[in-house]
């Protein structure tokens, strides 16, 4: 009788532990964004843009006239391709293909430009090359020529602003993976290291705060109004995206993989305590008084980087998932409007005060890159499980 009683009690304890475990697991995942709803938000925002720009090759007319393969549009297509990979609609593919063909698969301002902003379009060319089974070498001909010329020059100081990391690093690593030639990985690190350790005197990375100054003009003694260092949200978002993409394509055996991983994880960790209550991050990460408020682009890039890390098992899901959910919920409810217009987007610039003040109905100088950031975020949030 004693043995039966003991066995029964033990079974109840085990059942209770199992139940708690299941409940805990369900609690962790209970608030995951609904996949259909994530796609609906992304599709709504994207359709608004495609309706407004039916001709992907059309020049962009603002204060100046820009060819449509400039960096802002390139970032949009990075997001569109990411969306296509989780929701392969032919219209997305055709839109990206038409854009690439109209620019002859070449860089903005010529094949041998050294400016990462002009080269960013190459990321989509490389993606389309792979999507079609590597059957069209003309799609990567000029990208490869451009990167090869960078390598041949021996120079490594071109990425003097941190936005350039997102525009340029993924091209080197994608080429490295596609061709199997380690020279692209080597050059990528050489240029990254110059930005991190040398630009501005001692580099643009603050190892103490685990955040990045946008360029040398923001390295101390420059301060924000509250006396803190100036860490621009979108600028640090570009670094997050650059590192996520670099980790995706760089072999783990690469001698610099662990450094990329550490920098990526440290940056994400630095973002945790400064997320706003409403889910967004301020444009000035360490000075909420300097145009603090909702801002979509930096927040979307942080969501992209964090969700990517969760999906790849690079960061702790329990720690980061609530942060991602809170931020994505803010984007879905506050940023993407019922008609697809994207609100709270800081215009182009280099610091918190640019493009201010923001508003729910304010149209930024370019409407494309903000959408690209949101589509990148949506593509990784969709994969969460």
Over which residues does each language-model region extend?
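Helix-capping and short linker residues that terminate individual alpha-solenoid repeat units
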Residues: 50, 54, 88, 104-109, ...
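Bacterial N-terminal signal peptides that target proteins for export
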Residues: 1-9
């Amino acid at each position: 009788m004693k043995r039966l009683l003991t066995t029964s009690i033990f079974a109840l304890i085990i059942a209770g532990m199992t139940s708690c475990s299941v409940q805990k697991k369900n609690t962790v995942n209970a608030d995951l964004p609904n996949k259909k709803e994530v796609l609906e938000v992304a599709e709504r925002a994207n359709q608004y843009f495609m309706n407004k720009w039916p001709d992907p090759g059309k020049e962009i007319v603002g204060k100046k006239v820009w060819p449509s393969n400039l960096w802002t549009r390139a970032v949009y297509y990075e997001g569109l391709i990411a969306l296509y990979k989780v929701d392969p609609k032919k219209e997305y593919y055709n839109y990206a293909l038409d854009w690439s063909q109209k620019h002859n698969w070449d860089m903005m301002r010529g094949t041998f430009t050294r400016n990462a902003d002009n080269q960013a379009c190459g990321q989509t060319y490389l993606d389309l090359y792979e999507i079609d089974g590597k059957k069209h070498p003309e799609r990567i001909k000029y990208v490869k020529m451009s990167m090869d010329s960078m390598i041949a020059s021996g120079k490594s100081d071109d990425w003097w602003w941190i936005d350039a990391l997102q525009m340029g690093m993924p091209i080197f690593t994608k080429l490295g993976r596609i061709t199997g030639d380690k020279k692209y990985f080597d050059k990528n690190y050489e240029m990254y290291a110059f930005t991190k350790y040398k630009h501005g005197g001692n580099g643009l990375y603050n190892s103490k705060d685990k955040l990045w100054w946008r360029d040398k003009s923001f390295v101390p003694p420059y301060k924000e109004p509250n006396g803190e260092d100036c860490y621009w949200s979108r600028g640090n978002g570009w670094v997050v995206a650059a590192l996520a993409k670099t980790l995706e394509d760089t072999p783990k055996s690469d001698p610099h993989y662990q450094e990329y991983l550490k920098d990526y994880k440290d940056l994400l960790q630095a973002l945790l305590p400064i997320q706003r209550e409403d889910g967004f991050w301020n444009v000035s990460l360490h000075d909420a008084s300097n145009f603090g408020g909702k801002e979509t682009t930096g927040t979307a890039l942080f969501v992209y980087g964090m969700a990517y890390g969760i999906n790849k098992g690079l960061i702790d899901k329990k720690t980061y998932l609530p942060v991602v959910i809170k931020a994505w919920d803010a984007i879905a409810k506050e940023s993407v409007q019922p008609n697809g217009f994207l609100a709270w987007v800081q215009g182009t610039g280099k610091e918190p005060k640019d493009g201010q003040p923001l508003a729910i109905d304010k149209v930024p100088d370019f409407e494309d890159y903000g959408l690209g950031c949101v589509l990148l975020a949506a593509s990784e949030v969709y994969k969460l499980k």
